[in-house]
Amino acid sequence: MVQGKLENKKIGVLGGSFDPAHVGHVRISKLAKKNYDLSQVIWAITKQNPFKKNNPNDLYKRTAYAKKINKNNKFIKVKCFEEIIKSNRTVDLIKYLKKKFKHSEIFFLMGADNLINFHKWKGYNSITKMCKYWYLIEMDTNQRLLDLNHLRNIIKKQLNL
């Protein structure tokens, strides 16, 4: 269950298919919690990643496994929001969470490997405006924190704006 009493807190959001959830996801969550003093990290499991052609394993099994590997990480909450928000898009999830946790800061978490296609995401520009900070991690290199202004500059360069 995602905690509803997180007023004036910092909440990280890590979305994906989690097929399967693995130590890298846990590592991203722990590093973001430590670096940003997050109260909670929400793993938002999607039924189907719009950028992946393959059919993922059963949602129930993926969710159960994600919860199992986090049994000792009480700050990580695992949930599929698609039935609630009627969308599998990150922009819609962030809008929902910003409304639900009005007085909290939302921190968007993602692997740096997703940055290359970020400009293809529906509502990517809105996501950059709604989230104060992003946490990007490259799994095989040093962890890096990237503030939103720097990220906007990267996106502008990619799009030649």
Model-predicted regions and their roles:
Residues 1-161:
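Nucleotidyltransferase catalytic core that binds NTPs
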